[in-house]
Amino acid sequence: MNGAIQAKRRALAAVEGPHPWRLRSLAVCASTETELGRWLERQAPAEQLTVPRLVVARRQCFGHGQQGRRWESPAGGVWLSAALPWPAEPQVAAAPGLAVALALAEALIARGAPVQLKWPNDLLLLTPTGPRKLAGLLPGLRLRGSRIRWARIGLGLNGRNPVPAGAANLRQQPGLWHGEPLALTALVLRALERAMALAGEAEAVRTGAEALLAPTDPQWLEGAWWQPQGLAPDGGLRLVRGDGRERILRRF
């Protein structure tokens, strides 16, 4: 499966040369997040990661998203976790969740899928019956002291798999191979490479992601309504209260 993914990924590369990857593909696992964590514990370098690593599974038994919520992961979707080289200095590094969400959204839009970003870490497919969840991200950073060693991203993308109420897949998208998971996995790898290229461009990532952000409801906090006013560089949601006070809401 690794060779097939790499071949399809190279076929999607218009100009850029092949990016090195260390891949592990599994028929089934409890969680790609767990598998990646074990791999990194055993073999990761002491300092920064230099070659991206990725674990992909045909299906997961216990996939999870934000705050431990279960993510349905049957065969037919793309279920993976990746460790990505990232700038060591936090002040110049883009938020990995924003960078990956932006890169994946742009890749899907370029192939005809109308998508938006839902804060904090979801991609929505715009359908005739309204927006539906298409993908979810689980981002993070591995630090040593104040320096970044690598970024981590867990990703679930609905391809041909059955989906629960409120979600969508890509079966009806001819530009995306009608959701064929191997081709979609290659597309995701290309999006991850794009995210790595954007990793040192925090402001470009923030503005790009903000342009694709779905409308966000007002937030009731501290006894008052706060209006969303875009994104902070770290991916937090900027909120403004009626008296002009500002705060950042973070859920990642």
Write out the residue ranges for each language-model feature.
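N-terminal lobe of the biotin/lipoate ligase/transferase fold
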Residues: 1-109, 129-131, 231-235
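A generic structural signal for short beta-strands and their flanking turns/coil linkers
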Residues: 51, 76-78, 119, 151, ...
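General beta-strand structural signal in soluble alpha/beta enzymes
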Residues: 57, 115-119
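Long, positively charged amphipathic alpha-helical accessory segments at protein N-termini or as interdomain linkers
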Residues: 2-9, 18-19, 87-115, 125-252
